[in-house]
């Protein structure tokens, strides 16, 4: 008896869907059916876009392992954001993330974001180290997730103030250590001699990969560093504690780590625009604007092309899933049976502040829809 009731219900459902009937029993007009169908498709696509944007916001926070968006104001960002060459290059390169699906077929294996570069700003030490009676720059904290054998490059960037005439500058980077019996409290990391010309100040990078790896292997040995950069007259040119007009000139560490393996995937699908009358499963353009979210903590890109899938899945599945096809004909927007979903996705590169006010450059997998299909 239950089976009969189910069959009757399905039959009525199909009949009503295929041949609509008005409440008074008369058949509804069919002359505007095609127009109504197009309007319904537009409404469906608009709903899909809205859902996709909300899903992207949730995915980004989840993949970055953030419980909520970092609360960092634009004024704080202006103070913290280094005006250094490597960072400016990243910002210029990824200001607007483009759709590269036409020439790329690589996809990350993992769900979570893959860190490629970390920009670490100096912070207060857990234990205050003093030399010559006053605190010295700088102390850097590192995430325990950074493995010493994954570090490819580690550069300390320092800003040297401008000079009024051609000058030779002597730069010393010292690593602070626990006081020894003879009173020694530091050991040398790097020393170099630079020739500076009059004009604007300059950024100088120093290789500190070996020191960083030692710190990662033995965190208790990380007591900080001291930066010295004296000209011929003994004037210290290094900006260690920025003064008025020196926002963004703090020393910082640029650390690059190895990326995860990638696999190659190829697929094919339809591409449509917002004015398309295509009813089949298709990829549509969608640009996500982070500034519209109020997400100032994302440095770059400010916008990126995410795309989304929309459309019907019908005849392709007729032979393999005949009953599913029937249900889709009756209710093409229903949840049963194959759906129009992404079949290939690619990552985006992102430069952002995390909750600890560190600048991270990483890759977030599966954020751009490259192809759509029925599955």
UniProtKB/Swiss-Prot annotation:
Supply one GO BP term: negative regulation of satellite cell differentiation
Keyword annotations from UniProtKB, A to Z: Cleavage on pair of basic residues, Cytokine, Disulfide bond, Glycoprotein, Growth factor, Secreted, Signal
- State the InterPro entries in the record: Cystine-knot_cytokine, TGF-b_C, TGF-b_propeptide, TGF-beta-rel, TGFb_CS
Q: Where in the cell is it found?
A: Secreted
Coiled-coil stretches: none
* Example of a GO MF term: cytokine activity
Residues spanning the signal sequence: 1-23
The chain's disulfide connectivity reads 272-282, 281-340, 309-372, 313-374
Question: Gene3D superfamilies from the entry?
Answer: 2.60.120.970, Cystine-knot cytokines (2.10.90.10)
Which residues of the precursor form the propeptide? 24-266
Q: Which residues are glycosylated?
A: 71
A Pfam family that the UniProt record links to this protein: TGFb_propeptide
Its Gene Ontology cellular component terms are: extracellular space
- Principal localization reads secreted
Please report which protein family the annotation says this sequence is part of: Belongs to the TGF-beta family.
**Record text on subunit structure and interactions:** Homodimer; disulfide-linked.
| Function in brief | Acts specifically as a negative regulator of skeletal muscle growth.
For this entry, the protein name equals Growth/differentiation factor 8
Which species expresses this protein natively? Answer: Coturnix coturnix
